[in-house]
Amino acid sequence: MALKHFLQFNDLNADELAHIFERTRWIKEQFKAYQQYWPLTDRTLVMIFEKASTRTRLSFEAGMQQLGGSAIYLNTRDSQLGRGEPVEDAAQVISRMSDIVMIRTFEQEIIERFAANSRVPVINGLTNEYHPCQILADIFTYIEHRGSIKGKTVAWIGDSNNVCNTWLQAAEVLDFNVHVSTPPGYEVEPERANLYGTDHYEEFTDPMEAARGADLVTTDVWTSMGFEAENEERRRDFHDWQVDADMMRVAGKDALFMHCLPAHRGEEVTADVIDGAQSVVWDEAENRLHVQKALMEYLLLGKVQV
């Protein structure tokens, strides 16, 4: 298979995603049955972190080990990347000493430049612009609980951040709808709105209307990493964009709730929702592990049939 990266959700087409979701299901079944599956023996994943993480590091490191490979952790503070080495040079060296690379950083441009100079697949573990692995896990979680997401409606409540951007990309690829409701001043950037078009998403000023009849309601923290100086201002601005029991009732009894975590109970979501019967956040978090295993398998081995 030709070298392929996963830097944005739409780097994979619907057929490739269907394969990855099916492989995720099988890989998860093997994991739950304590069945060893080591297709990546002697393969090495290098994980480069500029942004701190719990779930991203744990899911990639454990996932690579569970597939029989090994994972090496680098952060920019302790490597030459943090001392001014050009990204292009680092990519040349790191990709000669590894089989696959995951990067969690601030600017999408950094990961794009790294991938352009890499000999091995590069995965976006998160940037300010996109969070594709999270949406892979979210959609797989929806499929587990409700079946195909095609034609369904996802309500995004809160900041139009990297997770929101990735939902918009996913809607185009997999043919579902996204309702976006943000406070004034936090809307989807016009250039992104033009990029994604309006066939699969609609913006709402009223968050309750965005959630009405939705199949999935999802949100994220009001203040993402890098915006801590705006925390108090954002708490005021986002006050009415909280997912609570009333919003879930408007969505409907079969609607699911998701959150990429970590969550701030009492801010973007109430405790009774995130800990309630419609919440699937713990399955969603676990599925980062399994869907990323399927992703790494695909990027390194192509379409495996077992």
Swiss-Prot record:
It is an enzyme of class 2 (transferase). The keyword Amino-acid biosynthesis applies. Keywords: Amino-acid biosynthesis, Arginine biosynthesis, Cytoplasm, Transferase. The lineage of its organism: Bacteria, Pseudomonadati, Pseudomonadota, Betaproteobacteria, Nitrosomonadales. GO terms for cellular component: cytoplasm. Its EC number is 2.1.3.3. Belongs to the aspartate/ornithine carbamoyltransferase superfamily. OTCase family. GO terms for molecular function: amino acid binding; ornithine carbamoyltransferase activity. It comes from Methylobacillus flagellatus (strain ATCC 51484 / DSM 6875 / VKM B-1610 / KT). It is found in: Cytoplasm. L-ornithine binds at N162, D220, S224, M225. The keyword Transport does not apply. Reversibly catalyzes the transfer of the carbamoyl group from carbamoyl phosphate (CP) to the N(epsilon) atom of ornithine (ORN) to produce L-citrulline. One of its GO terms (biological process) is L-arginine biosynthetic process. Pathway: Amino-acid biosynthesis; L-arginine biosynthesis; L-arginine from L-ornithine and carbamoyl phosphate: step 1/3. Carbamoyl phosphate binds at S53, T54, R55, T56, Q80, R104, H131, P132, C133, Q134, C260, L261, R288. It catalyses: carbamoyl phosphate + L-ornithine = L-citrulline + phosphate + H(+). This is Ornithine carbamoyltransferase.
